[in-house]
Amino acid sequence: MTFKNILVPVDGSDASMEAVSLACTTAKRNRGKVFVVYVIEVPRSLPLDANLGPEAVKGEEILSRAEQRAEEVDFQVQGELLQARDVSHAIVDEAIERNVDGIILAVSYKRPLAEGTGFAWPRGGKPAPLPGEFHLGRVFQYVLQNAPCEVWIIRLPMVE
């Protein structure tokens, strides 16, 4: 299993920046490339190429942070801001288009709500995961089921 060309979707979280570092280290060792994408999910009520100014600015800032993270390990990434109807489909489509060997997804650790916080789940809602459990969500689920390549998922350690 050699990752040469790697796709890393970023959202600005510390976890996604760690995924960029891991991808750069791996691709550098294998003389490959890293493609970093920030996907703006465009509501169906707007045209796909709608000008989403504030979100585009946020995406460009996050891509810039990813490029800086790559420079820390003496590597260059190719960053791209994408607009799509669905983030998960955009990630898989980008992996196909760029013919990558792997996708590295990052998930942040989210602590379940403590008992006695007064929080009540809405009717039909689900309780918080037990300690050590978490739910990846629809984007991760779709990418895991449909990616044409290997998918790595990283999670940062719990912070007390």
Task: Give residue spans per PLM region.
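Alpha-helix N-cap and loop-to-helix initiation/capping positions
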Residues: 11, 50-58, 128-135
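Active-site loop/turn elements of alpha/beta-hydrolase fold enzymes
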Residues: 39-41, 84, 156
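Gly/Ser-rich helix-loop-strand patches that form or flank binding pockets
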Residues: 97-160
